C-alpha cells in the first residue's frame, strides 16, 4: 500500500507518463485509471493507442460514479433507482411549487430550481448536512443570509423526505461505506488523472483506495509541492493544497509515501509566447516578454454569449485562412 504523486506544470506530460507506465504492465497486473466522467472516453482511446490496440483484459478506465455502480452490484444495496439530473430538477420543481408560500426568496422564481439543485449537490459533496445549515442560520447576525439559509433548509429537508431514489452524490456516499468490503480494488495499481481537485467525498474514497490497492498514483498540475500561504501569488495554490492533503491522508492511515515524480519538460507549449505566459503568470518576480506578441489576443466581451461567439468566429477564421 503506497501513494505516489506525479506532478508538473500544464503540458509536462503527466497523463502521457501514466499511459506509458500502464502500457508497460498492461495485462500483467490489475490496473485501474480513474478519471472525471467527461474524460473517460478520451482516456480509453489514448490507453488503447499506447497499448498498440491490444486487448486490455486487466486494465480499465473508470470513473467514481462507475466505480460506485460496480461496488453496489458486488456488495448489494442496489434496490433504489438512480435519480438523473433531469429527474432531480423535476422533483425540486414540485417541492418548490408546494413550498413557495413558505419561502422568503427561493419561491419567487421557478428558475431557482437550478440554484437549489446545485447547492444541494455541493452540500452533499462536502459533507454539509441540514444540521450544519441550521447551526449557521442560528448563529449568523446577517438577517438576509439567515432568511436565505432558512429557505435552503426547507428545500433540503423536503428533498430528503421526498426522495425515493439515489442522486449522484448519495451513490458516492454508499461507495464510501462499501468499498472496503469490495474485492475489486485489492492489490491493484491505481492511477488517478485529470482532476483539478477533489471533493470531501472523493478524498474519503481515495483514502480507502490507498488502504486497498498496492499502489495509488495521483497526477497534480503544479510546479512543486511546497505549501504556499498566499493564494494571490501562486496560480497552483489549490493544486498544492490537494497534494499536501493527499500526503496527510496517507500519513493518517499509515500508507507508505513513495518518491514523487517531477516532470519539467514542456511538451504542449511549442509557441514561445504561450510558454512565457505559462511560466510567468502569477510569478513573483515575473519576466517581461521582449518581443511583440502575435499569438495572444485580448477581447473584452459584454457577456459570456458574445465571448463564445467571438471565440467561435476566430476559430473558423483560423481554420479557413491559416
Q: Residue ranges of each PLM-predicted region?
A:
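Helicase P-loop NTPase motor core
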Residues: 1-4, 10-29, 37, 179-180, ...
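Accessory N-terminal region flanking or inserted into the helicase ATPase core
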Residues: 2-6, 17, 96-194, 201, ...
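Structural motif
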Residues: 7-10, 35-39, 192-197, 221-222, ...
